[in-house]
Structures are given as structure tokens and as C-alpha cells.
Amino acid sequence: MNGFAVIPSVTTTTTSGEPIASDVARKQNLLELDREGLERFFEDVLGEKRYRAHQVMKWIHHRYVADFEQMTDVGKALRTRLQACAEVRVPRVVFDKHSADGTHKWLLAMGTDRKNAIETVYIPDKGRGTLCVSSQIGCGLNCTFCSTATQGFNRNLTTAEIIGQVWVAARHLGNVPHQRRRLTNVVMMGMGEPLMNFDNVVRAMSVMRDDLGYGLSNKRVTLSTSGLVPMIDRLSTESDVSLAVSLHAPNDKLREQLVPLNKKYPIVELMASCERYLSVNRKRDSVTFEYTLMKGVNDKQEHAHELAKLMRQFDCAMQVKGAAKVNLIPFNPFPGTCYERSTEVDIRAFQKILLDAQILAMVRRTRGDDIDAACGQLKGQVVDRTRRQAEFRRTIEDRVGRDVAA
């Protein structure tokens, strides 16, 4: 998995439809490679010592230089060879938006055809700056309360497209790893299910945590999953980042409505996989369980008591108080949704039940909702391959039709 990637052949066409060979398509995008992959590329393809790869990696991820000619401590002969067989191709910024609260959102074009685009969000806070990164164009899991799900699914992002989001944001922010940090945390909580794009996500997270990359500690990189049990087990053996689970319901009946994946991996199996994750990764002492609160759906007191019991069971299984942390997320509405945000009174009452049960529970402050950058609102631009967009539009039209008739 860590070897240098072989870029698939890509061709363009003339106006008459005849294929034209693309020199760019044959070049290795160095953003695809982690440290080991870059070392192998320099040794096997360029015939260079591995330490030369370290020089170039720092130019790319510390100084945000994409032009080999600007890498002044790299010899001219090597720069010439790099120009011939490699490139640093970063995502193109379609537009960026600033929120009144300081949140920043980028729409980034993906792929050579530029038809698809994903969203990346930077959330500044006191003493920290968190980047929310996407892993797929769209999402195939169809969670009913998530805006991304209404867009359908196109494809997985490449490693370069994932780490390219970090590159674009870090460059914009003037981030200097190990010195002037504006980017202190990365959360794989953007568009898509990260564990359905396992290899590319793990490789990108390796660059995020590498001292030659962005130098983030393992605990400052968080992967959020809807609950692919076998892949959580695999992740435990290949990475030790922080784990978050999109739970959103305390029982299987309700969770199957909100997160259809629960039909395949019910809560008991999901919780067991989280226990195994912490058992393997001794440096991690907790799992964060995300719970989006929706009015009249999952925000009742009985739901809070059920959730508290589930979290206590997890703490007992791990024999660690606070092994389960709950992140309560007020629902962020989007066009066409049938859900509403819980009232502030109900949110605080829900949290109090958890706190009274000695469960660590915090309410996530809504950020960036004025630019549709809040949790659950990311949408991007997806050429749907699942026909879900059409189904969602029909649902909205049917609902509008009923309202008009009434």
C-alpha cells in the first residue's frame, strides 16, 4: 500500500473525438505518495538516494511549492528529471467562502474533467484550527439526515485528492509545520465514508502525521465512520488515529432508519469493534460517539437514558471511565430535508441525563451554517452514479405537490 502509485492512463480527445496522448497523465503525482512511497519512487524510478525524497517532501508539504524549479536545494539535473516524469498536481479551487464566525469553506474540483467537486472546511477556535476533510465524491451509505447522501455517489478520492485538501488549506492559512501552526487538527468527517476508501485514506493520514508532512500527532487526526465493522478492525492494525463513530441512535430499530448500514452491522457488533480498536491501540483511551439530535426523532428522554446505558456498558467493557465520549450535534437543516433541529431546551435536557449518568457529553457548537459548512451540510458537486439525486428530487416534488393540494 505504501509503494508509489501507478497513475492510470488518461486521454483527452480532439473535437472529432480522436484520442490525444497526455504527457501529464503519464507523470507521477507526488501528492499520491507517503514518505515510503516517495523514497521508493526516487530510488526505483529516478535512481536517487532516498534522502533526496525527504528534501522534495518538505518543499511540497512545508513550503507548499508545486514547481520543481523553485526547489533551490535540489540539483538542476534532478529537477529536470522530476519535470519529465513527475508533478505536484493539487486540487483546483472553484470558490471559497468565509463565514461570519471565521469558518472557511473551499469547493475543490476533482479529476481531469473537473465535473465533480468536493467541499473542505476549516474551523478556527481558541488555540486550535480544525480542517474537515472529504474522502469520497458523494456517499453511498444513504444516511437520511445528511445532505451529502442526497447527492448520490460518484467515486473514491485518490490519496492526492485527499491530502491535496490539506495542502490547499494549509497554504491559504500560512501554516508552518512545527513552527507557526494554524492547522492543528484534521477530522475525516467531510463528504463520504472514509473506511470505504481505506487505502487512500490511510496513506493520506500517514502524510498528515509525518514530520516531513504536516507533523500532526496521532490523536489530532480523527477518522469518523458510520460503522463498517470489518474495516474498523483493519484500521486498528494499520493506524492509531483517534476514532469517532456516527451513532445517532441508541437502538437498532431507530438507527436502521437513520443509518441504513446498521442493518448489516447492528449496534452490538459496532460497539464490540470499538472495544477491539481500543484494546489494540493502547495509546487511544476513548472513542467519540457522534449523535445528531433531531426534533421528535431521537431527542426524547428515553433515548438519552438508552444512550447512557449503552455508553456505561462500553466503559465497563473497557474498564475505563470515560472510554465512551458523546458528541451531541444539533441537526443542521438543508433544502428538502424532513428533519428539524431539536430545541435548545431539549438538547440541554438530553445532555444533562448523560452527564448525570457520569457520561462525558459535550454539545458541538454549530459553526459555518451561514455558508452551509456545518456538520451534515456538505454537498459539493457530484455527478451521481447511483440515481439518488433524482430520487431525492422526486421526494421533494411529491412533498411540495401534497402541500399545494392541501
Swiss-Prot record:
The record places the active site at 119 (proton acceptor), 375 (s-methylcysteine intermediate)
- Detail the disulphide connectivity of this chain as listed in its UniProt entry: 132-375
Which miscellaneous remark does the UniProt record hold? Reaction proceeds by a ping-pong mechanism involving intermediate methylation of a conserved cysteine residue.
**GO molecular-function term, one example from the UniProt record:** tRNA binding
Q: Where does [4Fe-4S] cluster bind?
A: 139, 143, 146
Could you tell me which PROSITE patterns the record lists for this protein?
Answer: RADICAL_SAM (PS51918)
Catalysis: reaction(s): adenosine(2503) in 23S rRNA + 2 reduced [2Fe-2S]-[ferredoxin] + 2 S-adenosyl-L-methionine = 2-methyladenosine(2503) in 23S rRNA + 5'-deoxyadenosine + L-methionine + 2 oxidized [2Fe-2S]-[ferredoxin] + S-adenosyl-L-homocysteine; adenosine(37) in tRNA + 2 reduced [2Fe-2S]-[ferredoxin] + 2 S-adenosyl-L-methionine = 2-methyladenosine(37) in tRNA + 5'-deoxyadenosine + L-methionine + 2 oxidized [2Fe-2S]-[ferredoxin] + S-adenosyl-L-homocysteine
Do you know which PANTHER family this protein is assigned to? 23S RRNA METHYLTRANSFERASE, RADICAL SAM CORE DOMAIN-CONTAINING PROTEIN
Domain Radical SAM core residues, every copy: 125-370
Name the UniProt record assigns to this protein: Dual-specificity RNA methyltransferase RlmN
- Main location, first listed in the record: cytoplasm
A Pfam family annotated for this chain is Radical_SAM
Query: Superkingdom of this entry's organism?
Result: Bacteria
Protein task: Specifically methylates position 2 of adenine 2503 in 23S rRNA and position 2 of adenine 37 in tRNAs. m2A2503 modification seems to play a crucial role in the proofreading step occurring at the peptidyl transferase center and thus would serve to optimize ribosomal fidelity.
| Family listed | Belongs to the radical SAM superfamily. RlmN family.
EC number(s) reported in the record = 2.1.1.192
Q: What GO cellular component is one of the record's annotations?
A: cytoplasm
State the InterPro entries in the record.
Answer: Aldolase_TIM, Methyltransferase_A, RlmN_N, RNA_MTrfase_RlmN, rRNA_lsu_MTrfase_RlmN/Cfr, rSAM
Q: Which cofactors are reported in the record for this sequence? A: [4Fe-4S] cluster
* Protein's GO biological process: rRNA base methylation; tRNA methylation
Give the record's keywords alphabetically: 4Fe-4S, Cytoplasm, Disulfide bond, Iron, Iron-sulfur, Metal-binding, Methyltransferase, rRNA processing, S-adenosyl-L-methionine, Transferase, tRNA processing
Record localization:
Cytoplasm
Annotated positions binding S-adenosyl-L-methionine? 192-193, 224, 246-248, 332
Q: How is the cofactor bound?
A: Binds 1 [4Fe-4S] cluster. The cluster is coordinated with 3 cysteines and an exchangeable S-adenosyl-L-methionine.
